[in-house]
Amino acid sequence: MSEIILDTETTGLSVKDGHRILEIACVETENLIPTKRVFYKLINPEREISADASRIHGYTYEILKNKEKFADIAKEFKDFIADKKLIIHNAPFDISFINSELTRLNLEKINIKKNVIDSLEIARSKFPGSSNSLDNLCKKFNIDLSKRTKHNALLDCELLRQVYINLVGEKEPSLQFKHCLLYTSDAADEGLGVDLGGRRI
């Protein structure tokens, strides 16, 4: 079964305040093993970035002002995720931002009930009363966080893949395939690569 592990970074916490997506990553997997197909973009959010958000992911408008706008990448994004289940941690947050961007362009929104698996919901059902942030789940499952000095959508997709495997009781993927390095043009430009055996390069 094909899935897409998806993560975004944004200019702030809520679309209601006009905040927008500035980074999006989608990693295709087959039975949770990466296929080497990746969609990754840094995006000009067309607005300033809140100081709190910038502290989390490290991006500023100055860094992103010459990147593509969401309108420029929307079709490629929609084509990439078409007919795939999306695995997202705290899905309502990411989907609210994605659907806000799609609505701006009069494009069909993502149906969160039909097309999305929320790993946070699964974690809350398995570990009620615990903090189930991505960081805390990585610690719980002994997943290496040493490279996560800032939030990064591409790296976080790989961390989420490993967390999700543990949540659903699958075999550790590093035993099933050799390390493979994923790059996209934006990732290469920013010096970002993710070794899908769990190391970021």
Annotate each predicted stretch with a short phrase.
Residues 186-196:
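A short, hydrophobic C-terminal helix/tail in secreted or cell-surface proteins
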Residues 183-188, 201:
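Conserved small/polar residues in nucleotide/adenosyl-binding loops
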Residues 120:
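Short, flexible loop segments at boundaries between secondary-structure elements
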Residues 1-114, 124-127, 134-151:
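Conserved non-catalytic scaffold segment of RNase H-like nuclease domains
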Residues 166-185:
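Acidic two-metal-ion nuclease catalytic site recognized across multiple nuclease folds
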Residues 152-163:
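Acidic, divalent-metal-coordinating active-site segment for phosphoryl/phosphodiester hydrolysis
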